[in-house]
Amino acid sequence: LFSCLDEIAWLYNIRCNDIAYNPVAISYAIVEKDKAHLFIKLDKISQEIEQQLAEDGIELHDYHHLFLFLDEQNKENTYFVDTNTCNYAVFNHLAKKFEVREIESPIPLLKAVKNTTELDGFRLACRKDGVALSKFYYWLENRLSQQPITELEAAEQLTRFRSQDKEYVSDSFGCISAYGPNAALPHYSATPEQQSEIHPKGLYLVDSGAQYMHGTTDITRTMPLGELTELEKEDYTLVLKGM
């Protein structure tokens, strides 16, 4: 029984948007010797997808019917689960009736080996992201030559450039747009109430990414926006050498 959402998405080759920034569906999966089951909100499944899954030997069930399904199964069944990802309620329900064996899920190692289609998709996603970032760098330099901008304005503009690609789906996480001292804060998050103005001097960090139909990107860049102090130059160089 699988409950880790990215593993299920990979195993059945399905994508959804149930969780912000992540192309996964809230679901469970059970794989038997000769067939498989997917527990998911059925209104998300089109007739075409349902037919394709059926052809692949995958039976669909309502997400909330997992326990009902398990209650109807032969008590002689044995279920294998990864307790690093299986939640407490599911594990307890299984253990009341069945033999449960704790294993490490085989999927992470399997999906770590990329096929040609996946590799080509990654490269294409990176090229698409490079186009958006090039536009962003040009825009940032020109805007700052006219007036300061806020950290959120910069983040929103980067998303707009990415979304110009027809195969852009969403950002892959909330953009970290951090100017000056804010860039030193781990996972800094600008808000309308608390953010800094960006000026044509000092250092600006942007940590962002996108979900494209072909793959996912995640980049971090630290940009000099004007003349730097000797300390800024030294810090930047030491960080670069340490990578």
Tell me what each language-model feature is.
Residues 1-243:
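Active-site neighborhoods and metal-handling regions in enzymes and metal-associated proteins
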